[in-house]
């Protein structure tokens, strides 16, 4: 639909189109208000999650792809220097946290919902916190300014996944697309095999990496300068606050939306790196990370919602680039739909493998010998 636009018009469209994330955040209170007086009060809490995973994949196919890249010499420096894009991403933080607290209050006081409506509410809020909150935190923790670092950490603390702040930058980006990385799914590996290992390894590896950082400074692992202690303490304060304010239902709400949010994150990791690997060189090291080591998805609509997260190939090759100047590479392996559609597909391993395994084999045509059991484990 928009692929024929000139690069200049596409960049202008996206500059203001990134505010589309507000639809996801406002979808939570809107779904509640629309439920008032409804004959089906337990259906409305499921609205957001239903739209994300039911309607968005269809809209991605209709709206189409975005091939436009900013011009490297003239447009990229100007766009990276514009404070507008930073304000846009940082604006998500107070609105998401406000939405989270308000949603907990609604769950604790809404008497028309039975467990079905309550479950839909928790999953919908978790979907927004995962899709928007963790996506923005991912953008922020890669940047140097302390404000952005702290804002990203706060969003992760709000979903009990602060370890991502350490492990993603110092672990995943170092070992991506190798057997050493728990966030890089192997060829032939199902989502349900991937998730438990990702949860466990990424939590433990975050603590290991932070302990190593402190050791280099001559400090013990359990030291007040261990940032994970502080971030997890904030998560504990969130839990305590929700429990005191909204009772046991508030605690379930906070923990439930957290699990939904960080599970979405790990499913996206599964999608982003499935079956791709960096070759081991003669010296025992792995080849340098390039845009060819992550799946790219260039569907415009979801890229606007997710701050160009789907241009993941460029992100891994150049992690410090800001979201507004991430590039599309035709040479990168390409996903057949946006992340929402790919997440749904990943939930059904036979369908996932029927679609994705041929794409992996085609991408490594002539090098299929690398897709062995040893590469998968």
Swiss-Prot record:
**Looking at the UniProt record for this protein, which Gene Ontology cellular component terms does it annotate, in alphabetical order?**
plasma membrane
What is the membrane topology listed in the Swiss-Prot or TrEMBL record? Multi-pass membrane protein
For this protein, what reaction is catalysed?
octane + 2 reduced [rubredoxin] + O2 + 2 H(+) = 2 oxidized [rubredoxin] + octan-1-ol + H2O
Keywords linked to the UniProt accession: Cell inner membrane, Cell membrane, Iron, Membrane, Metal-binding, Monooxygenase, Oxidoreductase, Transmembrane, Transmembrane helix
Which compartments is it annotated to reside in?
Cell inner membrane
Q: Where is this protein primarily located?
A: membrane
UniProt protein name: Alkane 1-monooxygenase 2
């Amino acid at each position: 639909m928009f692929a024929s636009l000139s690069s200049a018009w596409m960049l202008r469209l996206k500059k203001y189109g990134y505010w589309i994330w507000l639809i996801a955040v406002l979808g939570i209170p809107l779904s509640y208000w629309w439920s008032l007086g409804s004959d089906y009060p337990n259906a409305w809490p499921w609205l957001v999650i239903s739209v994300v995973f039911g309607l968005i994949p269809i809209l991605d196919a209709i709206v189409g792809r975005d091939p436009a890249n900013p011009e490297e010499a003239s447009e990229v420096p100007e766009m990276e220097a514009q404070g507008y894009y930073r304000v846009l991403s940082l604006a998500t933080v107070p609105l998401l946290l406000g939405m989270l607290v308000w949603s907990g209050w609604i769950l604790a006081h809404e008497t028309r919902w039975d467990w079905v409506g309550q479950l839909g509410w928790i999953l919908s809020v978790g979907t927004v916190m995962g899709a928007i909150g963790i996506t923005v935190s991912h953008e922020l923790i890669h940047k140097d300014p302390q404000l952005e670092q702290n804002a990203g950490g706060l969003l992760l603390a709000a979903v009990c996944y602060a370890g991502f702040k350490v492990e993603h930058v110092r672990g995943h980006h170092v070992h991506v697309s190798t057997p050493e990385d728990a966030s890089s799914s192997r060829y032939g590996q199902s989502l349900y095999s991937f998730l438990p290992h990702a949860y466990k390894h990424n939590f433990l590896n975050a603590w290991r990496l932070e302990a190593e950082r402190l050791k280099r400074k001559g400090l013990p692992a359990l030291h007040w300068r261990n940032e994970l202690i502080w971030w997890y303490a904030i998560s504990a304060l969130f839990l305590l606050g929700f429990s005191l304010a909204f009772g046991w239902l508030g605690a379930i709400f906070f923990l439930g939306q957290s699990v939904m949010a960080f599970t979405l994150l790990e499913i996206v990791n599964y999608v982003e790196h499935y079956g791709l690997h960096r070759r081991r060189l003669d010296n025992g090291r792995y080849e340098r990370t390039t845009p060819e080591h992550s799946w790219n998805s260039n569907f415009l609509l979801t890229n606007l919602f997710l701050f160009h997260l789907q241009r993941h190939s460029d992100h891994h090759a150049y992690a410090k680039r800001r979201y507004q100047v991430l590039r599309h590479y035709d040479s990168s392996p390409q996903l057949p739909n946006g992340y929402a559609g790919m997440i749904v597909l990943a939930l059904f391993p036979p369908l996932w493998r029927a679609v994705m395994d041929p794409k992996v084999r085609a991408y490594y045509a002539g090098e299929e010998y690398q897709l062995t059991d040893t590469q998968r484990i």
